[in-house]
C-alpha cells in the first residue's frame, strides 16, 4: 500500500505519554478536521500539483505542502539511509487514520520499532494491536466511540474552560473503562489555557502536556 507522506524526520516527542522519547515522525498528508489553531495546516489537502518524488521528501528542510506517495519498503529504506537510531515511530498528520495503517504498523514492528498513532478519532483506526493510540478529540468533529475505546491515552487540547465540557462528555461514554492516561494540552502556549490545564489536572489527577518541542525550538 502507498501512503501520501509529507515528511519523515527524527526528533524528540514533545507531547503526551511519550514526551522526551527519541522518535521518528512519519507525517501523512490529508485532514478533514481543519482546526482553526492547527499548526500543520499545510497537511490538510492532498493536491496533485504538490506531489513530488520520494527522494525529494528526504531532502525537505522546512515544512510545506509538498508530499509523495511511498510504500512501507521505501519508508523503511529512508530510515536506514538516514541511520536514525530512534526505535519509537510516531505516525501523525494531518489525520493518519484516513488510511489503513495495518500494513505499515505491522511491518515497522517486524523491524523492531514501537509505533504510535496520533489521531483525532474521527476516522476508523486500522493498525496493529500493539500500536499505541494517542487520541486527541476535537470539538468541531464527532469522535467515534470505537476510537475512544481503542485509545491508550487521551491528549485533549484546551483554549478555554468551556472546552472541557466536550472532554467530560467523551469520558462519560467510556465510564466502564478505566482511563488513567488523560493529558490536557494548552493550545499555542496560551497562558490562560495553561493555567486552566494546570488547575484541572491537579483537581482531576490528570497529566499536563506542554509541547516541549516548541519551548526547545526543535522540530
UniProtKB/Swiss-Prot annotation:
An MF annotation (GO) of this entry: 4 iron, 4 sulfur cluster binding
GO BP annotation list: queuosine biosynthetic process
Pathway membership, UniProt: Purine metabolism; 7-cyano-7-deazaguanine biosynthesis
Spans traversing the lipid bilayer: none
Binding positions for S-adenosyl-L-methionine per the UniProt entry: 94, 136-138
InterPro entries from the UniProt entry: 7-CO-7-deazaguanine_synth-like, Aldolase_TIM, rSAM, rSAM_QueE_proteobac
Domain Radical SAM core: 18-219
Classification via Pfam families: Fer4_12, Radical_SAM
Catalytic reaction(s) noted: 6-carboxy-5,6,7,8-tetrahydropterin + H(+) = 7-carboxy-7-deazaguanine + NH4(+)
Enzyme Commission number: 4.3.99.3
EC top class, as a word: lyase
Domain of life: Bacteria
Residues where substrate binds: 12-14, 27, 92
Keywords linked to the UniProt accession: 4Fe-4S, Iron, Iron-sulfur, Lyase, Magnesium, Metal-binding, Queuosine biosynthesis, S-adenosyl-L-methionine
Subunit details: Homodimer.
HAMAP family xrefs: QueE (MF_00917)
Role of this protein: Catalyzes the complex heterocyclic radical-mediated conversion of 6-carboxy-5,6,7,8-tetrahydropterin (CPH4) to 7-carboxy-7-deazaguanine (CDG), a step common to the biosynthetic pathways of all 7-deazapurine-containing compounds.
Name of this chain's protein: 7-carboxy-7-deazaguanine synthase
Name of the coding gene: queE
